[in-house]
Each structure stands twice: as structure tokens, then as C-alpha cells.
Curated annotation (Swiss-Prot):
<comment type="similarity">
    <text>Belongs to the SSX family.</text>
</comment>
<dbReference type="InterPro" id="IPR001909">
    <property type="entry name" value="KRAB"/>
</dbReference>
<dbReference type="InterPro" id="IPR036051">
    <property type="entry name" value="KRAB_dom_sf"/>
</dbReference>
<dbReference type="GO" id="GO:0006355">
    <property type="term" value="P:regulation of DNA-templated transcription"/>
</dbReference>
<keyword id="KW-0804">Transcription</keyword>
<protein>
    <recommendedName>
        <fullName>Protein SSXA1</fullName>
    </recommendedName>
</protein>
<feature type="compositionally biased region" description="Basic and acidic residues">
    <location>
        <begin position="87"/>
        <end position="101"/>
    </location>
</feature>
<feature type="domain" description="KRAB-related">
    <location>
        <begin position="19"/>
        <end position="83"/>
    </location>
</feature>
<keyword id="KW-0805">Transcription regulation</keyword>
<comment type="function">
    <text>Could act as a modulator of transcription.</text>
</comment>
<dbReference type="Pfam" id="PF01352">
    <property type="entry name" value="KRAB"/>
</dbReference>
<dbReference type="GO" id="GO:0005634">
    <property type="term" value="C:nucleus"/>
</dbReference>
<feature type="region of interest" description="Disordered">
    <location>
        <begin position="73"/>
        <end position="101"/>
    </location>
</feature>
<keyword id="KW-0539">Nucleus</keyword>
<dbReference type="InterPro" id="IPR003655">
    <property type="entry name" value="aKRAB"/>
</dbReference>
């Protein structure tokens, strides 16, 4: 019995150019123009599949973590700041518990 390969040859797919392809338009809105230009084609495709996977999982009723690139820039910045606040508060708590003599 022959096995068929289900892998996709990205170089030979017959899709529209990425500028007009809906999937790339959906993803490009999460990046600045400069960031988008710096991404390789394979990175762009990875983001397309990450978004599709997230959408599929949530449509099935599963709880999934929103990919970082899909979060708003403000929300990501606040998250990073709150994480750094947590680290510094833990460090200060440790210093109070174990004072240096």
C-alpha cells in the first residue's frame, strides 16, 4: 500500500501573491509595515497557521491562549511591565525574608 505525503510544498503552491492573499492580509494587520517587511515568507506562513489553529480551537469551544502577536501592542506592553513588577516584588520579598548580615 502506497503512502501519500500530506506535506505542503510551499514553493510550488498555486496561491495568489502574498500581497493579495486574504490569509496574509489577516496576519499583516498585527505587524507594523517595517516588521512585516523583515519577516521571511516562512515566518509569515507560520503566523498564518498559528492564527488558524487558534481560531479552530476556539471555534470548537476549547480554551486557548491568544498568541502574543495577536494581542494589542498596549496589552503586550502592560503584560511585560506587570511581569517585571512581579519579578522585582518577589526579589524584594526574598531580601526581606533573608536579610544580609
Amino acid at each position: 500500500m502506497k503512502r501519500r505525503s500530506h506535506s505542503v510544498n510551499l514553493g510550488k503552491t498555486k496561491h495568489k501573491p502574498e500581497e493579495t492573499c486574504q490569509a496574509f492580509e489577516d496576519i499583516s494587520k498585527y505587524f507594523s509595515k517595517e516588521e512585516w517587511k523583515k519577516l521571511s515568507r516562512s515566518e509569515k506562513i507560520t503566523y498564518v497557521y498559528m492564527k488558524r489553529n487558534y481560531t479552530t480551537m476556539t471555534n470548537l469551544g476549547l480554551r486557548a491562549h491568544l498568541p502574543d502577536f495577536m494581542e494589542s501592542k498596549e496589552r503586550v506592553t502592560k503584560s511585560v511591565l506587570s511581569d517585571s513588577d512581579e519579578v522585582s516584588s518577589h526579589e524584594s520579598q526574598d531580601k526581606r525574608k533573608n536579610p544580609v548580615v
